[in-house]
From Swiss-Prot:
Zinc fingers classed as C2H2-type: ranges: 248-271, 466-488, 496-518, 524-546, 563-585, 591-613, 622-644, 650-673, 679-702, 1019-1041, 1047-1069, 1075-1097, 1103-1126
Basic residues bias (residue ranges): 351-362
Acidic residues biased stretches: 302-332
Role played: Component or associated component of some histone methyltransferase complexes may regulate transcription through recruitment of those complexes on gene promoters. Enhances ligand-dependent transcriptional activation by nuclear hormone receptors. Plays an important role in neural progenitor cell proliferation and self-renewal through the regulation of specific genes involved brain development, including REST. Also controls the expression of genes involved in somatic development and regulates, for instance, lymphoblast proliferation.
Protein known as: Zinc finger protein 335
InterPro entries reported in the protein's UniProt record: Zinc_finger/UBP_domain, Znf_C2H2_sf, Znf_C2H2_type
Source organism: Mus musculus
Tissue note: Expressed at low levels in cerebral cortex, hippocampus and cerebellum (at protein level).
Record field: compositional bias (Basic and acidic residues): 363-372
rRNA-binding in keyword set: no
GO cellular component: a single term: histone methyltransferase complex
UniProt modified residues of type Phosphoserine: 976, 1007, 1149
SMART domains in the cross-refs: ZnF_C2H2 (SM00355)
């Protein structure tokens, strides 16, 4: 880039204080347009290049910037480019006079030869025109001209007009022409005379890059003075010439020069003399050049060198006037100290002065009033200064050129520059372009009103024209703006306050929502529903819910928050809690202890119970019963032992996981450990980790083969947690729950069967006998062989320790199926074999209600003949009943006692009924003698026999006082024997139907003499006969007895005559534990607990099972062990009852019996006459009620067994874990029961759902010990016992004992008095029981 520019001395600005005078050449009067044009072009340079050291070409406004500009194309072509002379050369060029127009000033370099110009002042215009024509014909061609060259023309007193020429480069075709600045022309043609001598000044066209802060249109920012006449296009084209300038560029920086010597000097001083630069920096002469520059000191030595350089310049220019150009010194091209400040002639308008203060980085835009009154921005002298840090450190040239030399900046290469204003038409030169805007928000100082006109304004109107100056929010209306501004808390842009209350918020939207609390409604509302919102967009988004095009999702199922119990209505918040609660309605106890026989509903309670059976080995260490594992924690040992007997046989080999299904184990191993897919499809390559997924795959993908595949791979039923309740069972439980407080219903249960029966005959529909406790419902059918399995399985379930029957206690459901064929009747307990088709079956049931009442029913030939007897509740409701004899012809029923065969025809049948509450005061007995009458006898404590009066009966109680021929006790009509078979509708009367005409062995419980006291006080003291409601209180009372009428505290010497005083004193010792263990910190309230505790230290187990040999440290554990594991019926026994003092009634003769009963009947409302009574007591009976004295009742042996040893049959009936009586043949020694029930059809152990269903032994085979029994869980589809074996077992287990007993009792029973020796013989084993001896007369 050519950077050397020589200006004439006439262009220099005058020194301060001197008036502006035009030079003699006529060009001294120049307008500010020249200055503006040069400075504006320099201001548009995007980057600055390094200035030449010669300092030639300084043409800045104020001496800080060079008047240079770079081409827009930024050509990097090394070939020389065409340049145009600047305004100085134009102002000193010849003036060409156009024909018919004002004279035109032409640059001397445009001419091919300077001698062509007319140097004489008298040159005519025709000679000048011919010279111009030669120039155009020789140099200007159509391929080079893009526009017109800058020429100035004007008239006298008029301003000049500037036009431009764009030259095309030789290679890239980029426009590379610099604008020619205008200058003031003289009003006369005297300038031609000044130009006659030819050009003497040189002017090189520079190509500086643009400055980023500049304004590319600053040339046009001041419009030229109005001209009187303008040149046409043809005249202007005559003034054009293409000039090609060769340039030299430095490879180490962006410096360019038109001469080679200048470039070499630049390289020596800039790149090879760093010491010179440091010295120059130390002298401080590199600072900002003063606004009004002074002449620099020149030397004579540099002038010849500069003159040689001028010879090398292609376009040397011309010096207009040698006489007046005395200030020109070529030595100023070499930088020697501070550069000389060239002065320019001042324009007619005053130059803007520099403002005081530091130079600004950004230009300060100002307005100046022009002739047309329009304010146009001007770049002030201060705004055009370059920052000091951008100035060159060594070059004394203008600041603009020095800033161009910064190394390392991404600068464009300089060339022949041309501003955008040169391409514009002359008419639009006066339009001001907006300054380039920086991205982002402008600085705060540009927010004033005077700068708003330069901001970009969209042609579209603002949607929210009102702006908040505090936070910048915009609003639609002025009212919204005012409300918003007033809501600002103390002018804080991030805090808002409510104008009506003390509400504060940091969000404007929150305040808007709050304001609707004062207004009352939200402005936007949905058209289809009641939805409202503060914002309209929310309503629009909500309206999509009502759109028909949108697919509506189904409403999610509301999550249940309450789970009511279907039985009692109690509500639980969780399903798990409801499931646990439902167990309370179930009678099943699935968890049974194998050591003591206790059963539990909850597994947690069961495990806590198992901890009591774990005994320490030594040093409080516990050892596993199955292996050598030893630990110090009971719970850890229990969990270990449960792993040995777990009902989950499939165990993972990688972790402790166990399961009861093999496919679950395979899935577990695949998912958790191996990652394999063990379940593969047989029809394709599909495989999965879960068996259920394989089933789904086959059903979906191979539907045609799914049926065959399903037969080979049956689906196992899902396992669910118990208890299970069918809908019918739930309805029954609801009914029982609602009727539990009231009296029991006497009507039969619903006839709809619960279980599907294989066969149902319409002539003889099944009889449904529901158990009042909901544990068991039995359906009995007749005359169908398909029902054999049902009846047999029912009999076994009731006989062999079913959990539902354990809940019933001693009052287990007893059912007899009576077969009448001639004189035979086969009875079974809890079910039996179906009768032959030619017999007339009769079903008699006896079961206990939940409140303790019993119902005895008999049915014959269908439900229409069903007769039921409701038995009242009371302290005797938990009793067991037994039938000793059988009716002669019709048949009999039985309760919990063993049934016997009917006696041969012609023999007189005798019946003795003994209650399990025989030893209590007020015990009731029922006696049946001749099959026509049923007698109710009450045995009192004093030995008298009386009948209860109707006053003592509870309302609605139906007493089993069956009569035949006698008037009812309530005054109703007498029932004849002919109506006994059709009394199904008379069950609701207070007098029960006469079912005794066909039932002689019907056993019903006795009624309470007093419904109040006996129901609350069941236990009485043997010493003072005082009654107590609980056994524990009675035992405490007995221990406190110090005599018949004295009481003493067992823990201290305190004594008193009244039991309440001693009881109140003993309450003080309730928190004391005086009995302490000498080996540990255990302490107890009584010695008995301490004695039991001592067994844990000695590991002594004094109580052993006589069957399996297992030993226990408590007799109670042994008792439950035998009852649960070695008992055939496994009934749960009730609470022990307190017994009255010993009372024995022996009826040895008929006369004594008649007298006793006659006295009893006279004292009450008797129902039998003397003849009937004598006939009923024609046979002698022995009733023995003997209380056995046991020193320690808790340690007594309580056994419930049935023993069969061939011809000898002994039947032991128990209640409350005590043997109540033994029925045996006369002359046979009363043996203690030591054997199991013998079942002759094989020995089997069947386990169902973790419980032993039944155990069968072959007769004569040794009994298995407990340790030899292996509990193997089986599925319901697998049966260890065949159906035939079940039927045979049911027959043998239920009827074999009865058949054998009846075979031995063929004769009439005689009378034999029980002697004290015999009673003592029954006591030697510490067992309490009654003996009824049956012998021939």
């Amino acid at each position: 880039m050519e950077e050397n520019e020589v200006e004439s001395s006439s262009d220099a600005a005058p020194r301060p204080g001197q008036p502006e005078e035009p030079s003699e050449s006529g060009l001294g009067v120049c307008t500010s347009e020249a200055v503006s044009a040069d400075s504006s072009d320099a201001a548009t340079v995007p980057g600055l290049t390094e200035a030449d050291d010669s300092g030639v070409g300084q043409s800045s406004d104020g001496g800080n910037h060079s008047v240079e500009e770079v081409s827009e194309s930024i050509s990097t072509d090394p070939l020389p480019h065409g340049c145009l002379p600047d305004s100085s050369s134009v102002s000193r060029g010849p003036v060409a006079e156009m024909p018919g127009g004002p004279p035109a000033l032409v640059h001397s370099s445009v001419l091919p030869d300077p001698s062509m110009l007319v140097s004489d002042c008298t040159a005519s215009s025709s000679d000048l025109g011919s010279a111009i024509d030669k120039i155009i014909e020789s140099t200007i061609g159509p391929d080079l001209i893009q526009s017109c060259i800058t020429v100035t023309s004007g008239e006298e007193g008029g301003a000049e007009t500037t036009q431009y020429l764009i030259l095309q480069g030789p290679d890239d075709g980029a426009p590379m022409a610099s604008s020619m600045s205008t200058s003031t022309l003289a009003n006369s043609l005297a300038a031609i005379e000044a130009l006659a001598d030819g050009p003497t000044s040189t002017s090189a066209c520079l190509e500086p890059p643009e400055e980023p802060q500049g304004d590319p249109s600053s040339v046009a920012q001041q419009p030229p003075a109005p001209v009187t006449e303008e040149l046409d296009l043809q005249s202007l084209e005559a003034m054009m010439e293409v000039v090609v300038v060769q340039q030299f560029k430095c490879k180490m920086c962006q410096y360019r020069s038109s001469t080679k010597a200048t470039l070499l000097r630049h390289m020596r001083e800039r790149h090879f003399r760093p010491a010179l630069a440091a010295a120059a920096a130390a002298t401080g002469k590199r600072g900002r050049v003063r606004k009004w520059g002074t002449s620099t000191k020149t030397t004579e030595e540099d002038r010849p060198e500069e003159e040689e350089e001028d010879d090398d310049i292609v376009d040397a220019g011309a010096i207009d006037d040698l006489e007046e150009d005395s200030d020109y010194n070529p030595a100023e091209d070499e930088p020697r100290g501070r550069q000389l400040r060239l002065q320019r002639p001042t324009p007619s308008t005053p130059r803007p002065r520099r403002r005081p203060g530091r130079p600004r980085k950004l230009p300060r835009l100002e307005t100046s009033d022009l002739h047309d009154g329009v304010g146009q921005p001007l770049v002030s002298s201060q705004s055009t200064q370059s920052p000091p840090e951008l100035q060159d450190l060594e070059a004394p040239s203008s600041s603009g050129l020095r800033a161009l030399g910064k190394v390392g900046r991404g600068l464009v290469e300089s060339g022949v520059s041309q501003s955008d204003a040169e391409n514009a038409a002359p008419s639009c030169q006066d339009e001001a372009d907006a300054p380039p805007r920086r991205r982002g928000r402008p600085s705060r100082r540009f927010l004033g009103k005077k700068y708003r006109k330069y901001y970009y304004k969209s042609p579209k109107p603002l949607l929210r024209p009102y702006l908040c100056r505090i936070c910048g929010s915009r609003f639609l209306s002025h009212e919204d703006l005012r409300f918003h501004v007033n809501s600002h808390e103390a002018g804080d842009p991030q805090l808002f306050r409510c104008l009506q209350c003390s509400y504060r918020s940091r969000r404007w939207s929150s305040l808007k929502e709050h304001m609707f609390n004062h207004v009352g409604s939200k402005p936007y509302k949905c058209d289809e529903c009641s939805y409202t919102s503060v914002y309209r967009k929310d309503v629009i988004r909500h309206a999509a819910v009502h759109s028909q095009d949108r697919k509506k999702r189904p409403d999610p199922t509301p999550k249940l928050s309450s789970f009511p119990c279907p039985v009692c209505g109690r509500v639980y918040p969780m399903q798990k809690r409801l499931t646990q609660h439902m167990k309370t309605h179930s009678t099943e106890k699935p968890h049974m202890c194998d050591k003591c026989g206790k059963s539990f509903k909850k597994r947690y309670t069961f495990k806590m119970h198992l901890l009591t059976h774990i005994q320490a080995v030594a040093n409080r260490r516990f050892k596993c019963e199955f292996c050598e594992f030893v630990c110090e924690d009971k719970k850890a040992l229990l969990n270990h032992q449960l792993s040995h007997v777990s009902d989950k046989p499939f165990k993972c080999s990688f972790c402790p996981y166990r399961t009861f299904r093999e496919d679950f184990l395979l899935s577990h191993v695949a998912v958790k450990h191996t990652g394999a897919k063990p379940f593969a499809c047989e029809y394709c390559h599909f495989s999965t980790r879960h068996k259920k997924n394989l089933r789904l795959h086959v059903r979906c993908r191979h539907a045609n083969s799914f049926e065959e595949w399903g037969r080979r791979h049956p689906e196992e039923p899902p396992s669910r947690r118990r208890p299970f309740f069918s809908l019918q069972q739930i309805e029954e439980l609801k009914q029982q729950h609602s009727t539990a407080p009231g009296p029991p219903l006497s009507s039969p249960g619903p006839e709809a069967p619960q279980e599907p029966a294989p066969f149902q005959s319409p002539e003889t529909p099944p009889l449904l006998c529901p158990d009042a406790l909901g544990g068991t419902t039995i359906i009995y059918q007749q005359g169908a062989e398909e029902s054999t399995a049902v009846a047999t399985q029912t009999a076994l379930d009731l006989l062999l320790n079913m959990s539902a029957q354990r809940e019933l206690g001693a009052t287990a459901l007893q059912v007899a199926v009576v077969k009448s064929e001639g004189i035979e009747a086969e009875l079974t307990s809890t079910g039996g074999q179906p009768s032959p088709e030619d017999t007339t079956p009769r079903v008699v049931t006896l079961h206990m209600a939940e409140s303790g009442s019993s119902v005895a029913a008999e049915s014959q030939l269908g439900p229409s003949d069903l007769q039921q007897i409701a038995l009242p509740s009371g302290p005797f409701g938990g009793a067991s009943y037994s039938v000793i004899t059988a009716p002669p012809v019709e048949g009999r029923t039985s309760a919990s006692g063993p049934p016997y065969r009917e006696e041969p025809p012609g023999e007189a049948a005798q019946a003795v009924v003994v209650s399990d509450t025989l030893k209590e005061a007020g015990t009731h007995y029922i006696m049946a003698a001749d099959g026509t009458q049923l007698h109710h006898i009450e045995l009192t404590a004093d030995g008298s026999i009386s009948f209860p009066s109707p006053d003592t009966l509870a309302p609605g109680t139906k007493w089993p006082l069956l009569q035949c021929g006698g008037p009812p006790r309530d005054g109703s009509e007498v029932l004849s024997p002919t109506k006994t078979h059709h009394m199904g509708g008379s069950q609701g009367s207070s007098t029960p139907p006469p079912a005794a005409s066909h039932t002689l062995g019907l056993v019903v419980p006795q009624s309470p003499p007093s419904a109040a006291a006996s129901s609350t006080k069941k236990f009485s003291c043997k010493v003072c006969s005082e009654a107590f409601p609980s056994r524990a209180e009675m035992e405490s009372h007995k221990r406190a007895h110090a005599g018949p009428a004295a009481f003493k505290c067992p823990d201290c010497p305190f004594s008193a005559r009244q039991w309440p005083e001693v009881r109140a004193h003993m309450a003080q010792h309730s928190s004391l534990r005086p009995h302490q263990c000498n080996q540990c910190s255990f302490a107890s309230k009584n010695k008995k607990d301490l004695r039991r505790h001592m067994l844990t230290h000695t590991n002594e187990k004094p109580f052993s099972c006589h069957v399996c040999g297992q030993r226990f440290n408590r007799n109670g554990h042994l008792k439950f062990h035998i009852q649960r594991l070695h008992s055939i019926d496994g009934r749960k026994t009730g609470t022990s009852t307190a017994r009255a003092p010993a009372q024995t009634i022996i009826l040895n003769s008929e006369e004594e019996t008649l007298a006793t009963l006659h006295t009893a009947f006279q004292s009450s409302h008797g129902v039998l006459g003397t003849e009937r009574l004598q006939q009923a007591l024609s046979q002698e009976h022995i009733i023995v009620a003997q209380e056995q004295t046991v020193t320690n009742q808790e340690e007594a042996t309580y056994i419930q067994e049935i023993t069969a040893d061939g011809q000898t049959v002994q039947h032991l009936v128990t209640s409350d874990n005590q043997v109540q009586y033994i029925i045996s043949q006369d002359g046979v020694q009363h043996l203690l029961p030591q054997e199991y029930v013998v079942v002759p059809d094989g020995h089997h152990i069947q386990v169902q759902e973790g419980q032993i269903t039944h155990i069968q032994y072959e007769q004569g085979t040794p009994f298995l010990q407990e340790s030899q029994i292996q509990y193997v869980p089986v599925s319901p589809s697998q049966q260890l016992v065949t159906q035939a074996q079940l039927e045979a077992a049911a027959h043998s287990a239920v009827t074999a004992v009865a058949d054998a007993a009846m075979a031995q009792a063929q004769g009439l029973f005689g009378t034999e008095e029980a002697v004290p020796e015999q009673i003592h013989q029954l006591q030697h084993q510490g067992i309490e029981y009654d003996v009824i001896t049956l012998s021939d007369d």
